[in-house]
Design a protein with these regions (language model features):
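Catalytic Walker B motif of ABC-type/P-loop ATPase nucleotide-binding domains
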Residues: 156-160
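Conserved ABC ATPase "signature" region
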Residues: 98, 102, 109-127
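Conserved ABC transporter NBD signature motif
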Residues: 57-67, 73-74
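Helix-to-loop junction immediately C-terminal to a conserved catalytic motif
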Residues: 49
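Walker A (P-loop) phosphate-binding loop of ABC-type ATPase nucleotide-binding domains
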Residues: 36-40
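Conserved structural motif at the start of ABC-family nucleotide-binding domains
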Residues: 3, 18-19, 75
């Protein structure tokens, strides 16, 4: 499964350009899309799920051009987990999934088989008789993931799947996506750096509708290497001065004083600053603020 995006632009009627002349190839496995809220990630995913037509440029899914004549064919190959998954609150989990299977045109016996399989995979089998409105946010997200997989898509798109979840549920969702990516391509959109550290090797960093970086995790980390320092000071005025001069990826109050992680082009001249290893969060802040 290959997805290619060529010179894609989306400009809304109010003149706002949400996606600005982007190019991208999404390989098999999990591909991360990292960016702050408002970066253009959701608009891009609306194009990839055929909900929104681009202003210009093109998208190809295994060589099939995104256009109205091909949308039905493309939709059969795509599964989508939106950020909000408030599915039919009065139905039970199983009833909801059976209904989604009917909408997808899956034969009932095959639908039951797939529902049983994915309920087990997502640890929802014991909750299948619960009403959707009784579920926690994490459980609803897992039901949403099952509905996105019922028709066995080749390309799975997930939008901020861990937002608002507790740490245990966040880990569960990430592990499920890694598992499901063995047989398909997954586009994982998030603003949570930790999500991508745990799931993928390749990613794109998006800001204001453009890609600032596309490539491997290691290459992204290398971009910030030599540009990250740590300083610990008890002098609050010095800490404020450093915050004005550098981008800050971390600030902690410790027994020794205020500990800052600084990002910039040149090593700080202030005493006590030392070079340190780069984290993905450091690298993300570095490339988005150059």
């Amino acid at each position: 499964m290959s997805i290619r995006i060529d010179d894609l632009t989306v400009t809304f009627k109010n003149g706002v350009t949400a996606v600005d002349h982007v190019d991208l190839e999404i390989p098999h496995g999990i591909f991360g899309l990292l960016g702050e809220n408002g970066a253009g990630k959701t608009t891009l995913m609306r194009v990839l799920t055929t909900v929104l037509a681009p202003t210009s440029g093109k998208v190809l899914l295994d060589g099939t051009l995104y256009c109205e004549a091909n949308y039905e064919k493309i939709q059969k190959k795509i599964g989508y987990l939106p950020q909000e998954t408030d599915l039919y609150p009065s139905l039970t989990v199983r009833e909801c999934l059976e209904y989604m299977g009917d909408l997808a045109g899956i034969e009932k016996r095959e639908s039951k088989k797939r529902i049983d399989y994915y309920l087990e995979k997502t640890s929802l089998a014991d909750h299948q008789k619960k009403k959707m409105r009784q579920l926690s946010g994490g459980m609803k997200r897992r039901v949403g993931l099952v509905q996105a997989l019922l028709h066995e898509p080749d390309f799975l798109i997930v939008d901020e799947p861990t937002t608002g979840l507790d740490p245990e549920e966040r880990i569960r969702i990430r592990n499920l996506l890694v598992d499901f990516a063995e047989e398909r391509t997954v586009l994982f959109s998030t603003h949570v750096v930790e999500d991508l550290m745990a799931t993928c090797n390749q990613l794109a960093v998006m800001k204001k509708g453009r890609f600032l970086y596309t490539g491997t995790m290691r290459e992204l980390l290398n971009k910030a290497r030599g540009h990250v320092w740590e300083c610990c000071t008890e002098d609050e005025s010095l800490a404020r001065e450093l915050e004005r001069k550098y981008h800050i990826s971390s600030k902690q109050y410790t027994e020794e004083g205020i500990r800052l992680r600084l990002l910039g082009e040149n090593m700080p001249s202030e005493s006590g600053c030392i070079a340190c290893d780069v984290t993905l969060e450091d690298a993300y802040i570095y490339v988005t603020n150059r």
